[in-house]
């Protein structure tokens, strides 16, 4: 089944909310970008992207006009991984405004994600410097005696902070 989307247009801004997975038949790839100056994509409900979805994303994103700003919100871990591993996945004009970071509780084995926002928990690099990430401390999992920790290898998950410099 194709990923359902909700598309809204207001003047020269297109907002797309994705739901499910990004695959071969995702209607995202059919969104018209004619006269669009800003493209906002909400990925909060995306659960994964398959290999054909990756290929189609790259082909589709090459057609985004260079002067069109692209903002990605709540990018899920599966997509962050692709951004870090696949050259050309994230267009130069794109900015990840927020990402979902996996967390794990060693005490009760509970898994969850936390949303990190650009300018709060992570910063993009400037003037040749690498970006930075600041993790919240003492993140409770819901039980008094339990505390979450990030469930990622920081050097791999936040690799995009080293190479992505939006135009």
Where are these regions (language model features)?
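Short beta-strand/loop segment at the start of cytosolic alpha/beta domains
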Residues: 1-15
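Arginine residue identity/basic-tract feature
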Residues: 6-9, 35, 62, 114, ...
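Surface-exposed beta-strand edges and flanking loops
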Residues: 7, 18, 74, 152-154
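Acidic/polar residues at beta-strand termini and the immediately following turn/coil
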Residues: 8-10, 42, 104-105
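Amphipathic alpha-helical interaction surfaces in cytosolic regulatory modules
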Residues: 13-97
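Cys/His-clustered metal-coordination modules, chiefly Zn-binding fingers
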Residues: 84-167
